Regions:
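N-terminal short leaders/motifs
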Residues: 44-63, 158-163
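Charge-rich, well-structured scaffold segments of protease-associated domains
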Residues: 1-19, 52-53, 70, 84-210
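Active/ligand-binding-proximal structured segments within catalytic/core domains
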Residues: 47, 57-70, 77-82
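Short linear Ser/Thr-Pro motifs
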Residues: 75-76, 157
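An aromatic/glycine/proline-enriched structural segment found at the starts
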Residues: 1-55
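A generic structural signal for well-ordered coil/turn residues at beta-strand boundaries
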Residues: 29-30, 41-43, 47, 61-63, ...
Length: 210
């Protein structure tokens, strides 16, 4: 009620705005591979695919899978395999961004030109593993705990939390508490993660600048 009172105080006199355009539906997705010569010092590569929109329930298991694959943690699969074990890339990460009517999942890395193909092979190996081999109970439990810890840390930023809450209110007409979010993460199963990985990671596009 306090928030409503503050909003009414500052915005009640403002006229409502109406969108003057109709958003076109995303075109059918077709995977591609493209290499562009940019004469860069390193090879820069993005491997990605269309993913779930913000209204789909499967966005949460995909977010967890993406975090396991290449999230902001030293023990992500790609960081261990590509960077730590083989020393092929200093910068490698995966991200998932949901939009109103679609989404995108992407893996980015940079490397010496001579290491790019090996990096791609290792990445494809991890994608295949996530699609075909379910996580063990221990692996899943550790991944959930880490993801929840990351969410808890990010919620300490008031600005970040309020932006997320505002988006949730606009899209879902409600705001989950952090405990509700944690409960949804804890309820995810290894099968759910394998299923979304199979659907999203099976037909990836590739763009290379070198």
């Amino acid at each position: 009620k306090t928030a409503e009172a503050v909003a009414a105080r500052y915005f009640a006199s403002q006229p409502a705005s109406q969108r003057g355009f109709v958003r076109a539906a995303p075109a059918p997705y077709r995977a591609f591979e493209k290499t562009v010569s940019k004469h860069t010092h390193q090879t820069h590569c993005i491997i990605g695919s269309r993913a779930f929109g913000i209204s789909e329930d499967r966005r949460l298991p995909l977010a967890l899978v993406t975090n396991i694959l290449g999230g902001p943690c030293a023990n992500s699969l790609l960081n261990i395999v590509v960077r730590e074990k083989n020393g092929l890339s200093y910068n490698i990460e995966a991200s998932y961004t949901p939009y109103g009517d679609t989404g995108i999942v992407a893996i980015y890395f940079s490397s010496d030109h001579s290491n790019a193909e090996q990096c791609i092979e290792l990445i494809e190996g991890q994608l295949h593993k996530l699609r075909t081999v379910p996580l063990t109970a221990r692996q899943l439990s550790m991944a959930k705990k880490q993801f929840i810890a990351q969410l808890a840390i990010s919620s300490e930023s008031n600005e970040s939390y309020m932006l997320g809450a505002g988006k949730s209110l606009l899209v879902h007409d409600g705001i989950d508490t952090m405990e509700q979010v944690y409960a949804k993460v804890r309820a995810l199963t290894a099968r759910q993660l394998t299923e979304v990985a199979e659907e999203v990671f099976s037909d990836m596009s590739r763009l290379i600048y070198k």
